[in-house]
């Protein structure tokens, strides 16, 4: 079998067909290679994975290093803290993904913030006119200061975390905090659409002039929430 066998007999021989045909032809002459086991004895984390307080501090530090605005609070303070962030931002409209706990936004709604539930029909243009979005997350990685969303309850479509200019994300600690990426992957469903967020959207030109908000939210605020009465909260 030659590359030409994979090209439409009556169609033009364009570069795409030519390249794919050559690849198929080359693979056809290659003997099947047995799958080899991968070594799994590598270091999976550079910090103790069993120290929740240390992981929380590391996550806080790395999130802030990426220029996210990080806040800590107890669970019973969460509605008030979310309302405070939205009011301080001047937000009058906020997108609410399906499955977000209703109690999180009761204080904001009482302050006159309009809640826009997302049923999947909000267009990018409509989302661009919204002031803020509030979401939960699937987990957060302490070593890299990364938050992972997987479109689960309270997280919404990927579009929600990319279009609004202000993203408030809630991370439940310690249960949603892992030490490293290798420890995060087994907890994630590989077939779900994942969005990995390390700080607000930013890019730099050739002279390293940083511009934020080009590919996503200009402002990322993260609330690290600990169960009421827990000791791992340092007010911020």
Where are these regions (language model features)?
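The feature marks the mature, well-folded catalytic cores of soluble enzymes
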Residues: 2-236
